[in-house]
Amino acid sequence: EKLQIALSLEKIGVDIMEVGFPISSPGDFKSVQTISKNIKNSRICSLARCLEKDIDAAGEAMSVCDNFRIHIFLATSTLHIESKLRKNFNEIIEMAIFSVKKALRYTNDVEFSCEDASRTNIDNLCRIVEKLIKSGVKTINIPDTVGYSTPDELTFIIKNLFERVPNIHKSIISVHCHDDLGMAVGNSIAAIQAGARQIEGTINGIGERAGNTALEEVIMAIKVRKNILGVSTNINHKEIYRTSQMISRICNMPIPSNKAIVGSNAFSHSSGIHQDGVLKNRENYEIMDPRSIGLKKVKLNLTSRSGRAAVKYYMSEMGYKDSDYNIDELYTDFLKLADKKGQVFDYDLESLAFINKQQDELEYFRLQFFSVQSISNNLSTASVKLLCGNKTYTESSTTSNGPVDAIYQALNRITHFPIILQKFQLIAKGKGKDALG
């Protein structure tokens, strides 16, 4: 499954994929090794702490491919240094430089993450970044590890690095944002505007706690707001939806319907005003073409707020002409069903149109109510209320072998007509518990 995800990420066109933490387990080591053998068009990266055994494991796992990256991380905030690592800042710098030199024995592509950078003293951050770049780090990652930062704060940090670190031009600035306060994507976009040129994220925003930056959201923000951001990616946008759905299934993590870009409602319209506007010109209420992420077309949700235009659109999509049905009658019945079900589907409309056409003639017999209870010994008891002309007859407690026969015995007792069941078939005209029968 990890290989399947990696192949999909390669197909979508990610530049670098971090595929595991080899020291964590033999299974993770093997999966990193397997992915490294199979991925050809994206650079493979694996994670390591500032420990020799971690770096050795990462280098050995990826040695089966030609070009790879080792991503080292170490906390730099005072809180983490004092309470977690129990060291001083000078010792942190020494550990970081030693680990970078160790990683450079395996590859010339080393990334360093200053863990909890968003809560690190800016003077200390500038100091360690300068020394890391001098030691050979090509990518400096600024993580908002606990999702604490705001866009303005992250912008301040990155601008300070560009202004105060003299060798900053020798490295790419990256950000790794978490979504604890719901600002991961906003922070990532702000970082791009401040000069960051690598964004770390995950498809669907999957990740620790509240998740990471949703990659698909950043990608489409860059595409849609290119006039503001002025950058581009190598991503194949039309693979976004397929990749999102596949990862959702593999990870058993359903995508919320209101999720930006890939949620089932992202390109759906329920309001009649919006639906009419979209049918006239989709740009009235859509800033993205759904086809740009791999979807086929716009989706109109049929609800009690939908207008006649949406109903006529769906009937047309199913091949019906305006002359095939009465829009006023159909729309009236549609609203009744929508009030009951909440959302109506195209097959419901078809059923309503069919039922309307079949019930034009006055009915002498009309079934008002029936109830069936199955009891032991395969016996069933049926209660039936039947309208005959203007008079209502009621028959109850008719027992027979099976529920269908019990109903027909009850009907026969009321009408005294011989009822012969020639064919019995139960078909749901639609889906779900509210389907029309």
Swiss-Prot record:
The keyword Membrane does not apply. SUPFAM superfamilies: 2-isopropylmalate synthase LeuA, allosteric (dimerisation) domain (SSF110921), Aldolase (SSF51569). One of its GO terms (cellular component) is cytosol. InterPro entries: 2-IPM_HCS-like, 2-isopropylmalate_synth_dimer, AIPM/Hcit_synth_CS, Aldolase_TIM, LeuA/HCS_post-cat, LeuA_allosteric_dom_sf, LeuA_bact_synth, PYR_CT. PROSITE patterns: AIPM_HOMOCIT_SYNTH_2 (PS00816), PYR_CT (PS50991). GO terms for biological process: L-leucine biosynthetic process. PANTHER family: 2-ISOPROPYLMALATE SYNTHASE 1, CHLOROPLASTIC-RELATED, HOMOCITRATE SYNTHASE-RELATED. This is 2-isopropylmalate synthase. It comes from Buchnera aphidicola subsp. Uroleucon rurale.
